[in-house]
């Protein structure tokens, strides 16, 4: 007997769009001389004493085993001819905004997961197009024609399958998973490909002899619940292609922040305040983008010895004024005890967010 009822809504039309090696692709687009060469977005370890991590890399660099979150030093060791680019995140944000505007032509039910991926529910779309595959192809065409970048698309009746489908054929792929094909599609996948199944869960599943979707499908519900608790039921549903999570166009953000890690330690107050200012302006811009205001400003400081301090101040009124955020963050820094160690990271975050209110001054 099932512990939890199985309800499978297969009537929806969900698209998952994932930009192909987004940051690196933007750099290649803007500098054609990079095409065909291994490009890594991250600090050049030869200039930072080996510090830094890879943000992302293009497909040419991935041939050498380079991947995001790898240390820049290891990336260089794997591919000494790789071209390291620090990255221009303001430019990437601008391009991301351009792509989101393309999504909005087709549906307002868009759930951005990051700057380079999003879910779209096109069940009831603006153009009245019945085929989700046709919409996915149109979006790919529009992004290529107007932005000069490629993306991969997954189409299915839920978010779980759509995301798996977008990963199936990259770059510039389009994969459709119909309800009648879902079990066959999942059966062939390694369990570590299932989104939402973390490393520890994968190890535990392997210990149970579960390596593929087919293996998972054969395990009784109670066995999974005994081993994983409520997550066991989620696994039971995933193996059957069941996921009714809605595309949330109004995802609730609890905070908006900006932080930077410095290859060269900061010692001078003028340099520190200048970086606080940059972060504050970035936070103000993000608040503007997301039509949010906030009340609590948080400053994060990490020193050379990796001691990390965070301190917050709650304002009497909501704001997204860059000058005010900068002033408060600067005052917080002034209130901290002096530390002779240089600073390796500074971050400014706004919490206690609310939607924009018309009669509040929003000057940046």
Curated annotation (Swiss-Prot):
GO biological process, one term: error-prone translesion synthesis
PROSITE patterns: UMUC
Subcellular location: Cytoplasm
Entry annotation: catalytic residues: 117
Catalysed reaction, written as an equation: DNA(n) + a 2'-deoxyribonucleoside 5'-triphosphate = DNA(n+1) + diphosphate
Residues engaged in binding Mg(2+): 18, 116
Primary role: Poorly processive, error-prone DNA polymerase involved in untargeted mutagenesis. Copies undamaged DNA at stalled replication forks, which arise in vivo from mismatched or misaligned primer ends. These misaligned primers can be extended by PolIV. Exhibits no 3'-5' exonuclease (proofreading) activity. May be involved in translesional synthesis, in conjunction with the beta clamp from PolIII.
NCBIfam families recorded: PRK02406.1, PRK14133.1
Subunit comment: Monomer.
Family affiliation: Belongs to the DNA polymerase type-Y family.
Stated name of the protein: DNA polymerase IV
Organism, scientific name: Streptococcus pyogenes serotype M2 (strain MGAS10270)
Lineage: Bacteria, Bacillati, Bacillota, Bacilli, Lactobacillales
Gene behind this protein: dinB
